[in-house]
Amino acid sequence: MDTTVMIEEHPQIKELIAKRPIVWQNPDYGKRADLPLTRADIFDAVARWERFAPFLAVAFPETAAMNGIIESPLLPLEQMKPAWEALNHQSLAGQLYLKADSQLPISGSIKSRGGIYEVLKFAEQVAMAHTDLTYMDDYSVLATAKYHELFAQYGVIVASTGNLALSVGIMAATFGFKTTVYMSHDARQWKKDKLRANGVTVEELNTDFSSVIPVARAAAAKDDHTHFVDDEGSRDLFLGYAVAGVRLQHQLKVQGIKMDAAHPVVVYLPAGVGGSPSGVAFGLKMIMGANIYPVFCEPTHVPSVTLGMMTKLNEKIAVQDIGLDGLTAADGLAVSRPSRLAGKVMRTLLLGTATFEDDDLYRYLTKLVDTEDVIVEPSAAAGFTAIAPIMAQFPTLAGKDVTHIVWATGGDMMPESERQLDYELGQKLLTKINNR
């Protein structure tokens, strides 16, 4: 691709090539659009989650206290806020919250929403086709041996850098599906170990994520009884994430967080392939409308959604096309080509994007432990990096009546040794800043 022509049309690409953090403001935000999905699709997904709640409560006792509903807390960050202000040398007039998907049950990440949902839907389809299960039945019956034997005749395949593999792998193996995960070179070892411990077959490929997906897709295509979870374009994954809009609306009400034209809410979502943040953002906008503003956060080395949306080439361009290496410590964001759905559905719904340098992730995750005793993995701290640049770009989102929600996408299942390494690196980087 001719980057000279691209830079003429989109001058910010020069900054992307130089790996400098930028804010990209979406020129199409708020325009009318014919979207491929509707609110009715979201409520269909809500109903399916509720049908499966009795099964989840039995299969995963950690969900029993919530009656089988998988949801994360919305945490006020009263101690983190002054720490953020000190790090950024500026005040944060509004309120700061963490949407702690890092604490979601079963797989400890935002992927619990989409990955688990898609497996639930596949299990429902298989059960409906081959048994007398009805939509009004108690779905806890799906945890019995009869259904386990049925599901064992079917397979599930997914390609992932890590967290989607955990959610799909653990859920599919629990049903009894023959489960295979194809993983790229940047997947963390502990995630591979966890999957194998749950009876999942892990195929490791020494290539990047975008190259793994076609291999996984081809493997699934060889067997009519195998379902492929497509992180680049799955409608069901997308709708599983979108249910977050319904859930967050309720949490805002319960916690007395006002949202109207004078009290906007900004939501900061880390983006890799763009599937999970797009699904969540779609749900937020469909359910709550004009006064909630989604922002995507991406590494300077892998700004795939930013590049795809800026050029309107979407999945037809990868970060390597402009000379970037696609490497980042944020393993869940190490995706060089955006999903087919991300750019298309987000075209009028996404306020913009902000890119960040990896070191900042460690600084924020360490501060989050020190101030709130909350543990997240590096990519889950990405939202903190976007607050200052977004407030600078959009002064109306910098006032005292604004609520800022950082979406922490994963981290609860990290081994203690991994957490400690991340924390210590954050400490070193913070010391470096203090010694300047």
From Swiss-Prot:
Cofactor(s) the protein needs: pyridoxal 5'-phosphate
Reactions performed catalytically: D-serine = pyruvate + NH4(+)
EC number annotated for this UniProt entry: 4.3.1.18
N6-(pyridoxal phosphate)lysine, modified sites: K111
BP terms from Gene Ontology: D-serine catabolic process; isoleucine biosynthetic process
Source domain of life: Bacteria
Enzyme class: lyase
UniProt keyword terms in alphabetical order: Lyase, Pyridoxal phosphate
Cited Pfam families: PALP
GO MF annotation: an example: pyridoxal phosphate binding
Family (UniProt): Belongs to the serine/threonine dehydratase family. DsdA subfamily.
Name the record gives this protein: Probable D-serine dehydratase
Organism expressing this protein natively: Lactiplantibacillus plantarum (strain ATCC BAA-793 / NCIMB 8826 / WCFS1) (Lactobacillus plantarum)
UniProt lineage: Bacteria, Bacillati, Bacillota, Bacilli, Lactobacillales
